[in-house]
């Protein structure tokens, strides 16, 4: 296989990884999200991950996915769109930058899925993921998110976390 063919396969695998991550979050398929990561991962999402540990230290991917669940499960619906993939593929490293636009919604009335300004927080930014090939699959070993801006009701993250915690307690 030529290096160009190999690079195309890697690019396709990285895009699939981003797509699986977004789909997993939006459908709350946490095993799909977990499959996107190596067992140990460096996470730096700025303020969004600050409470989960030092971004310079690796953490267990299982713990990171549990943290995502503790927020996302409290939203009625999310939509993560990841686009404009830019690849860096060399003999020693594989990474990909991509734009993010993510809507996070708590409906005032779930029977009428109309979103008012106070029902949504949109986060716009850029991922920079670094990958390792593990058992023939490309997995995220380092993920950075730089938030460029957000629009909407930022308090929804607090409300979603409280709702997710209440859901967890009611299941016990």
Question: Across the structure, where does each feature detected by a protein language model lie?
Answer:
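Generic N-terminal initiation segments characterized by hydrophobic and/or small/turn-forming residues
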Residues: 6, 11, 62-65, 97, ...
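A beta-strand edge to alpha-helix "cap/lid" segment located at domain peripheries
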Residues: 73-84, 88-172
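A solvent-exposed, acidic/Ser-Thr-rich amphipathic alpha-helical stretch
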Residues: 32-106
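Short, low-complexity N-terminal intrinsically disordered segments enriched in polar/charged residues
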Residues: 1-39
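Aromatic-acidic/polar surface patches that form glycan- and anion
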Residues: 10, 14, 26, 57, ...
């Amino acid at each position: 296989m030529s290096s160009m063919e190999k690079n195309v396969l890697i690019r396709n695998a990285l895009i699939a990884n981003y797509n699986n991550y977004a789909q997993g979050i939006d459908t709350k398929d946490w095993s799909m999200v977990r499959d996107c990561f190596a067992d140990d991962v460096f996470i730096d999402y700025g303020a969004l991950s600050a409470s989960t540990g030092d971004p310079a230290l690796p953490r267990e991917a299982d713990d990171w996915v549990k943290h995502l669940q503790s927020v996302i499960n409290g939203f009625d619906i999310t939509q993560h769109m990841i686009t404009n993939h830019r690849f860096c593929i060399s003999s020693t490293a594989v990474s990909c930058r991509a734009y993010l636009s993510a809507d996070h919604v708590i409906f005032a009335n779930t029977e009428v899925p109309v979103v008012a300004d106070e029902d949504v927080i949109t986060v716009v930014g850029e991922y920079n993921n670094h990958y390792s090939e593990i058992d023939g699959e490309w997995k995220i070993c380092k993920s950075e998110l730089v938030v460029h801006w957000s629009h909407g009701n930022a308090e929804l993250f607090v409300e979603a976390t409280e709702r997710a915690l209440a859901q967890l307690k009611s299941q016990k």
